[in-house]
Design a protein with these regions (language model features):
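Macrodomain-like recognition of ADP-ribose-binding/processing modules
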Residues: 1-217
Length: 217
């Protein structure tokens, strides 16, 4: 049975939880950071495996507690700075389908793979995960991102063609607040009735001095 849910994956009663990871030994953001804090031994083991180049996309790394898979680490990106790719999600899901019996996994909870810091959206990932996992004879929970519309948790939505949407995540860099201040200042000057037209060279030199004073360059 497969269920689509909203909520905290750490409150799941499934025996195995899935963690999303990169392949360079960093768990600094998002759900991976929570796993790192909750399971420090798992993190040290994962970091060591990354150092030995044993972690790669298309392979899910199981972490055992009490002789069973407690955490299944799922690479959704190569480097922590890079966006997730849908092909990595598909490869990992294929690996899981081929290996869950060998790992003796009987119930499992997945986060929205590649969403959040990975840059993929639920409209892409949700249908792919549902269609890949829905026929497996084990208990599966898939947690959608917080704030997902209820209509996008329904089977009718999840059965749409996942190939219609972008397959690479998008990483948006947060703009430096100082630069934002400069842009707003320039806009105000241009709109001002006291705006004095100057040549490009003089303007550039003055702005260069301003940037240096602001510590932007």
């Amino acid at each position: 049975m497969i269920r689509i849910k909203l909520g905290d994956i750490f409150e799941s009663e499934m025996k195995t939880l899935v963690n999303t990871i990169n392949c360079v030994g960093v768990m600094g953001k998002g759900i991976a950071k929570i796993y790192k804090d909750r399971y420090p031994k798992m993190f040290e083991e994962y970091k060591d495996m990354c150092t030995k180049k044993l972690i790669h996309t298309g392979y899910l790394y199981p972490y055992y507690e009490d002789n069973s898979v407690k955490i299944l680490n799922f690479p959704t990106k190569q480097h922590w700075r890079s966006p997730s790719k849908l092909e990595y999600i598909q490869e990992g899901l294929n690996w899981f389908i081929q290996n869950y019996e060998r790992l003796k996994i009987t119930s499992i909870a997945f986060p929205p793979l590649g969403c959040g810091n990975g840059g993929l959206d639920w409209e892409t990932v949700g249908p792919l995960m549902y269609q890949s996992l829905k026929d497996l004879p084990i208990d599966i929970e898939i947690y959608a991102p917080f704030g997902t519309e209820k209509s996008k948790l329904q089977v009718e939505f999840l059965l749409v063609n996942e190939n219609k949407v972008n397959k690479t995540g998008v990483i948006y860099e947060k703009i430096n607040n100082n630069w934002l201040l400069v842009l707003q200042l320039i806009k105000k000057l241009e709109e001002s009735e006291y705006n004095i037209k100057v040549g490009r060279t003089i303007f550039s030199k003055n702005m260069l001095c301003f940037y240096q004073d602001m510590g932007l360059i």
